[in-house]
Amino acid sequence: MEERKIIHIDMDAFFAAVEQRDNPELRSKPVAVGFDGPRGVVSTASYEARKWGVHSAQSIAQAKQRCPDLIIVPCRHSYYAEISHQIHQIFQEYTDFIEPISIDEAFLDVTHNKKGIELAVDIAKEIKVRIKEATGLTASAGISYCKFLAKVASDYRKPDGICTIHPDKALDFIAQLPVEDFWGVGKKTLQKMHFMGIYNGADLRKVSEEHLVEVFGKAGHIFYHFARGIDERPVITYRERKSVGCEQTFLEDIYAKSAVIIELYHTVLELLERIAKSGFEGRTLTLKVKFSDFTQITRSISQEKILTKKDDILPLAKRLLQLVNYSSSRPIRLLGLSVSNATSEEARKEDKENSTLKPEYRELELEFEEWKE
């Protein structure tokens, strides 16, 4: 069987880099992109800011404590999306097998590329140069035979780096790889692994698949295979939008039922506006709630009828809210709503593609969508 050639391209501090490119006064200075308010959150931090411990999803208040000279720049999502589109047009010159993971990163399967270039590393080098010429921005690239290792490789020499993990070197590389760098290992999973004495790939490889499944559920299968350099997930070209959603962080935490219902109503109205603009049709409504301690939960409900009207969405949103325990000791910081489970023909084709994956790998893809938030 022919060895695959997978590239993972990840833009370096994308939002912050765009702002530094456009404003020379911001260059070489600690910059964070986000809303500069009492409830603001860092979307992206420049590398100068990261040296001070500033990172994405951190509150602006905490970021300023760590870096008093931090410069906050408002987020321009539509502008960043335009630049992202430019970058994806470059990808399309080399392959049609492109899987966007977010606005600033994507997988490319270049096993059979359009330009007939033999080495994936040469393609990655060309793409990096093309991105720099077209946008003035840098990207990091990881190359390997599977998505797991390609993504790990792209992080290995950031910023503006390139790293290849060859099949014959993969097991040695994984053996020394800290488990926190494994795809799917979050804080809670990391704590469990450390409690079990698992600190790197070599440690993980010593644990039986049965025991990993016993502790981590279906993810245990994934960790078992990753530790052995096995990742069969294909690069899937997403033709159809997966969901439409919106969320709001409140200026003050809320817990009174009346206040929460009012904010939920406003969130429903915003969601309806986005659905109308996008033309998206879905059957699953998901409620996202983030509490004052930054923990968050999601609750979902599906039905046969498409969700495009207030009379359909609002009652479902209220039902989902009833499943959430909030109080004065556990107030709500953020509410979000999204509609997914697309009804279009393209989405059904995509579902068929996904159905070829093993169940545990399909679950990983779904979980990764949540990790991005």
Kindly give the residue locations of the regions a language model identified:
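DNA-contacting surface of Y-family translesion DNA polymerases
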Residues: 8, 181, 189-334, 339-372
